[in-house]
């Protein structure tokens, strides 16, 4: 069991015990985070970034760690998220292996890694932990909450469970619930890991490690993170040179196969398999429609001034999750301004889900807009297609 923590990581100790949504508690748990920029005297210029499944908190280079981060082109002085103006915080998700407490962390009660004794993890737990970091920094209200991919789910849960925590929100390639296709893919990824004999019920080590299972899980993920349009343009049917091809008659032959293999091998030893299982399942469980029947965070679940924006079928229906009940869940969120952005080629979090987020937040009274970008790079476009995503983020933040 290994944790992979970047240099310069900061830590916030969560309240102990820290209750989990689906039962159980954590003791002496922590959240890893990093910061950029300077917090204004009135603490009004703070932005929080919540991430996808695998990133650490090192979104960009800073004084504590000059190494480029995973969102380097988006975050820094003069960049779309301009740290000359904004004080930016990025948190590593609870349940991860990148500094925050997760299955790879030591359980203080036993002195051994949690492994599968870690409590069931939900997106709501990740959101609550992030909110506690904001409070600990003395920030009463964020200028903007930014969430991408899984972080888009986390951001919505955070806004719903902690009313007033942000004035505005940017949801990038996120969703208000997991769709069947996405659940199916992640189920196969988890199965690949669990069927590897070296997984051993979660009891593996560096010598006996579920490398084959992790490699297959990562390949499945990468296929859904990009798009067929990109595969066609980038690889076509080009074959490997004879010296690159595998001796196995059914081994690597095409460039696209080699790309997947290389990508997977770079990942498998830098993310803990049990953490992968927990975070993956938390995404499948997330459904904002489940919050419709909860006690409202404000005086009414749906602001009467905007109730007409929702169809009649959006009234709470216990145990039933439909597009309308998702909209009703979104409409319970109180936010002044919001932007939902997605790539039209995204098959994992289809662009219709970002449009749904904008529609639901608008029904709750937000000045909410949706932008579907014609990027060929699928779900991962927000990590690489800065020419398209950068201007949208910059323009929105200029008015915050």
Curated annotation (Swiss-Prot):
<comment type="similarity">
    <text>Belongs to the AB hydrolase superfamily. MetX family.</text>
</comment>
<dbReference type="GO" id="GO:0004414">
    <property type="term" value="F:homoserine O-acetyltransferase activity"/>
</dbReference>
<feature type="binding site">
    <location>
        <position position="380"/>
    </location>
    <ligand>
        <name>substrate</name>
    </ligand>
</feature>
<dbReference type="GO" id="GO:0006535">
    <property type="term" value="P:cysteine biosynthetic process from serine"/>
</dbReference>
<protein>
    <recommendedName>
        <fullName>Serine O-succinyltransferase</fullName>
        <ecNumber>2.3.1.-</ecNumber>
    </recommendedName>
</protein>
<dbReference type="Pfam" id="PF00561">
    <property type="entry name" value="Abhydrolase_1"/>
</dbReference>
<dbReference type="GO" id="GO:0160210">
    <property type="term" value="F:L-serine O-succinyltransferase activity"/>
</dbReference>
<feature type="active site" description="Nucleophile">
    <location>
        <position position="149"/>
    </location>
</feature>
<dbReference type="InterPro" id="IPR000073">
    <property type="entry name" value="AB_hydrolase_1"/>
</dbReference>
<dbReference type="GO" id="GO:0009086">
    <property type="term" value="P:methionine biosynthetic process"/>
</dbReference>
<keyword id="KW-0963">Cytoplasm</keyword>
<feature type="region of interest" description="Important for substrate specificity">
    <location>
        <begin position="52"/>
        <end position="55"/>
    </location>
</feature>
<dbReference type="InterPro" id="IPR008220">
    <property type="entry name" value="HAT_MetX-like"/>
</dbReference>
<keyword id="KW-0012">Acyltransferase</keyword>
<comment type="pathway">
    <text>Amino-acid biosynthesis; L-cysteine biosynthesis; L-cysteine from L-serine: step 1/2.</text>
</comment>
<feature type="domain" description="AB hydrolase-1">
    <location>
        <begin position="45"/>
        <end position="385"/>
    </location>
</feature>
<dbReference type="InterPro" id="IPR029058">
    <property type="entry name" value="AB_hydrolase_fold"/>
</dbReference>
<feature type="binding site">
    <location>
        <position position="218"/>
    </location>
    <ligand>
        <name>substrate</name>
    </ligand>
</feature>
<keyword id="KW-0198">Cysteine biosynthesis</keyword>
<feature type="active site">
    <location>
        <position position="379"/>
    </location>
</feature>
<keyword id="KW-0028">Amino-acid biosynthesis</keyword>
<keyword id="KW-0808">Transferase</keyword>
<feature type="site" description="Important for acyl-CoA specificity">
    <location>
        <position position="186"/>
    </location>
</feature>
<comment type="subunit">
    <text>Homodimer.</text>
</comment>
<feature type="active site">
    <location>
        <position position="346"/>
    </location>
</feature>
<comment type="function">
    <text>Transfers a succinyl group from succinyl-CoA to L-serine, forming succinyl-L-serine.</text>
</comment>
<dbReference type="GO" id="GO:0005737">
    <property type="term" value="C:cytoplasm"/>
</dbReference>
<dbReference type="GO" id="GO:0009092">
    <property type="term" value="P:homoserine metabolic process"/>
</dbReference>
